[in-house]
Design a protein with these regions (language model features):
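Transmembrane beta-strands of outer-membrane beta-barrel proteins
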Residues: 1, 9, 93-99, 241-245, ...
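Surface-exposed extracellular loop regions of Gram-negative outer-membrane beta-barrel proteins
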Residues: 1-12, 50-52, 62-68, 72-87, ...
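Transmembrane beta-strands of outer-membrane beta-barrel pores
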Residues: 2-6, 69, 73-75, 85, ...
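Flexible glycine-rich, low-complexity coil/linker segments exposed to the extracellular/periplasmic environment
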Residues: 17-61, 122-215, 376-399, 458-468
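Short loop/turn motifs that connect adjacent beta-strands in outer-membrane beta-barrel proteins
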Residues: 86-95, 110, 237-238, 296, ...
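Outer-membrane beta-barrel signature, preferentially recognizing the C-terminal barrel domain
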Residues: 220-222, 278, 307-366, 385-419, ...
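Gram-negative outer-membrane beta-barrel transporters
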Residues: 363-365, 370, 383-506
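C-terminal beta-signal and adjacent terminal beta-strands/loops
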Residues: 501-510, 530-580
Length: 580
């Protein structure tokens, strides 16, 4: 909106809502003697070799039904006011300021049913309910043999596993899903009718798990507000300076649970709802310089500050305390955002025949990066917001801000050109190439639990945290990325063949070096083609993604064994697009 000839106002308001409902049933079968040798520390290829696959020794051991429902609503508005000025032919620019506010509401509700129908009466009831599947085993009712019904009657003999992972791995037989769902509903309906051991309340066949159905529920609200002021100045025709600052304020309020493990967690939840408020604000200055001494040379410099906020799931006020093994499931509500100071410098050359070539250097210094150091001994409960009686307990997975600064450095080379000067149809050729190389160094803190015993007399035992670190690359950061695109534009036709190649990526940290993970190198080819048709606004397009069907693979550091392999395959989109 133009208020005056040199004063402009704009703004927007948006609202959104997202729901995600999940209904998952797990049916568990167990084989006590599944392998011909120990499977500990063995890769998946070796697992396939030592598996017995003896269905006569596989038994039904229960099920789990999880229902989770999440909801997130967001409302955002933004207002910007801009004033353009020109004090002289050598000094002009604009002043701009504005505000943005975003409010989020989140909720999560989980319910969990499970059952362990391993008692004779329960299984006998199941056999009689589904005689078409278990007729040959009904005669076992009243004997101990009924608890060892093999996998055969559960098998879905019409299931076709097809070729899994290019035939490298055998999936084996699968249980009949329809039968298993019917068994689930049968025991859910007859949860207390098929068990002779009614003296123990937990011995019923089917239970609604009180603890897991309440403990992980949460709801909360986040308010984000940002105000900024910037000035964009042109000093003559060659120099542009843009500077300013953004003030960010973030407040969160989340409700979760503090609980103690009861003797029978499935029947009794020992916990109370708790509410936690947190607030932080930051001033984030920035500076951008652009100098263009001649028409074919462009020099840029930028100094900025950015934040990486912790995942909301990591700052819930959740505590679950188990007295049996003196352990705590713990979320750190005091984690702060990680802050990055960024420096970017680039120089670009532009010539009408050669095209555009640029070289860039970037640096990032990240403080307060969020990490997990593994287990931690509670030597002083006040450090973690815990009560005094929890001294000596163990936090299972302790996340906090990294006290060491993370350093990331890199170079970027970019080339873009169009061969417009070639004769005839060759003038439509297009070439784009980009190469980025980075190096990073991160000190990942590592906590070892040290036990010291003085046999005295008197006997004295002491437990302590030994904090150290190991050095590795920044997580999720490849050392090299290469993009190349070859295209052709002629009249109403446009096509691009592109390739993306990146080196291995450090994917997962871990206390144990053997469990840290990296990806394999990755190369992917894509094709995009479109043709304008002789109807105004109509075009036909073809997109082929992952032409060579590249595979994502993660591997453990030391053994080179696969930890994850994902086949996304090739996708082809063919269609029409109409613009009006």
């Amino acid at each position: 909106q133009t208020l005056y000839s040199d004063l402009f106002l704009d703004g927007f308001y948006s609202t959104s809502m997202a729901r995600n409902n999940s209904f998952i049933k797990d049916y568990n079968f167990f084989d006590s003697f599944a392998f011909t040798e120990s499977a500990l520390g063995v890769g998946i290829d070796r697992i396939q070799e030592i598996s017995k696959n003896d269905t006569s020794n596989i038994y039904f051991r229960g099920y789990n039904y999880n229902i989770s429902k999440s909801k997130e609503t967001e409302k955002t508005y933004e207002i910007n006011l801009e004033y353009d000025f020109k004090l002289s032919s050598q000094f002009s620019g604009k002043i701009k300021f504005g505000t943005k506010k975003r409010t989020k509401f989140r909720s999560f509700d989980q319910n969990n049913d499970d059952g362990v129908p391993d008692e004779a009466n329960a299984l006998c009831g199941m056999l009689n309910e589904f005689p078409e599947y278990f007729s040959e085993y009904i005669g076992l009712c009243g004997s101990s043999g009924i608890t060892r019904i093999p996998f055969y009657p559960y098998i879905d003999y019409e299931y076709d596993p097809r070729v899994f992972f290019n035939g490298r791995y055998s999936m084996g037989p699968k249980a009949d899903t329809d039968l298993m769902n019917d068994i689930f509903h049968y025991f859910r309906k007859n949860w207390n009718k098929n068990n002779s051991n009614q003296a123990a309340p937990e011995a019923v066949v089917h239970v609604f798990h009180e603890t897991s159905s309440i403990l992980y529920d949460y709801k909360g609200k986040e308010n984000y507000k940002a105000d900024y002021l910037m000035i964009d100045m042109n000093l003559g025709q060659k120099l542009n300076i843009t500077t300013g600052a953004r003030i960010e304020k973030n407040t969160t309020q989340y409700q979760s649970y503090n609980a103690w493990a009861s003797v029978i967690p499935s029947f009794v939840f020992l916990g109370d709802s708790t509410l936690h408020n947190r607030e932080n604000d930051y001033v984030l200055p920035s500076l951008f310089l652009r100098y263009k001494p001649v028409s074919w040379l462009n020099i840029r410099f930028a100094k900025t500050n950015t934040l990486t906020r912790p995942n909301y799931a990591d700052i819930l006020p959740l505590q679950y305390i188990s007295t049996g093994n003196q352990s705590i499931e713990y979320k750190n509500t005091e984690m702060e955002p990680g802050k990055s100071e960024n420096l970017d410098f680039s120089i670009a050359f532009n010539q009408k025949h050669l095209g555009l070539f640029s070289i860039g250097r970037f640096e990032k210094n990240i403080s307060g990066l969020i990490y997990s150091s593994g287990r931690r001994y509670v030597d002083d409960p006040t450090k973690y917001g815990l009560t005094d009686n929890l001294e000596g307990y163990m936090i299972n997975d302790y996340k906090t801000n990294n006290p060491y600064t993370v350093k990331l450095r890199g170079w970027e080379f970019d080339y873009q050109t169009r061969f417009w000067y070639l004769p005839g149809p060759f003038s439509g050729l297009v070439l784009n190439a980009n190469y980025t190389v980075t190096e990073s160094e991160v000190k990942y803190p590592r906590t070892e639990i040290y036990y010291e015993i003085d046999f005295g007399p008197p006997l004295v035992a002491q437990t302590m945290n030994i904090d150290s670190f190991y050095v590795d690359r920044l997580i999720d950061q490849p050392n090299e990325i290469f993009n190349l695109s070859i295209g052709y534009d002629y009249k109403g036709f446009s096509g691009r063949l592109s390739v993306l190649s990146k080196s291995d990526i450090f994917m997962q940290t871990n206390f144990w070096r053997e469990l840290r993970q990296t990806t394999d190198d990755y190369t992917r080819w894509d094709l995009s083609v479109k043709q304008i048709l002789p109807v105004k606004g109509l075009e036909i397009f073809l997109n082929i993604n992952n032409i060579t069907e590249a595979v994502d693979k993660n591997r453990y550091y030391t053994s080179n064994s696969l930890s994850l392999e994902q086949h996304y395959g090739k996708t082809i989109d063919l269609g029409f697009k109409f613009s009006f």
